[in-house]
Amino acid sequence: MMQVWKRSRNIGVWVAAIAIAGGLAVCAVLPASAEEAGNMVFYRGGFTRLSSDRSGETFANGSTGQKNDSNIGWYAGAGLDFLLSKDTWGAMDKTWAVGELGVQFNRFASNSVRGAGVSGSTTDVKTQLTMVTIDVSPKIKFREGQALRPWIIPVGLDIHVISPPSNQTQYLDIGLQFGAGAEYQVWKAFKVGLDARFHLAAGMTNTTNNYFTVGPYVGVSF
């Protein structure tokens, strides 16, 4: 358990360093060097935390009292931003409406347990607690023409797949996500950013699938 917390602390240090670098960029905000096309492909990764662990479930735990009782881990994902409007359909100047299509893999802290689920194994094997999230979300991106651009996701749609399945062998869930972040134009089409998101799931698997993420991303506009 201590090793898990140490790894999470190290991730937090990296995230803090990126946030500091972003703060320095704020002090020297420069106009963007060229007109942005509006579309972007991006890659994300960082720290994730479930609202509740899965230690009370048959498929996650072992037959000898061992438990997968941690709710922290990491995530990696990618997505596409598609420009919808450069003035939010006339509502706000220099404020873009962007549509995000993303996919994300979450791997929560996993332990070696004996005979998890229905395997009947007599040896300890690692049971991976994972979740895949596919999202379609609107982004409101502010400060057109500037190198540093904050943005928000007012509310987005999530589809979740959990593994292992719940006690009722269900694995599909639906939910909402809320997020905020900022990105900095490093050079031409290349950008770096930092975001934080909360995913609120419906619980259709009879498990609590809500989780939080924070981490950096890199993007290329096109």
Regions found by a protein language model. Name each.
Residues 1-38:
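Cleavable N-terminal export/targeting peptides
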Residues 24-42, 86-96, 146-147:
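Outer-membrane beta-barrel biogenesis signature
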Residues 36-37, 50-58, 64-66, 94, ...:
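Predominantly the C-terminal beta-signal and adjacent terminal strand-loop region
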Residues 47-49, 74-166, 214-215, 219-222:
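Gram-negative (and chloroplast) outer-membrane scaffold detector with strong preference
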Residues 57-66, 114-122:
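Solvent-exposed loop segments that connect transmembrane elements
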Residues 67-69, 147-149, 162-165, 186-193:
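Substrate-binding/catalytic groove segments of enzymes
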Residues 134-136, 154-159, 172-182, 196-198:
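Hydrophobic alpha-helical segments of small multi-pass membrane proteins
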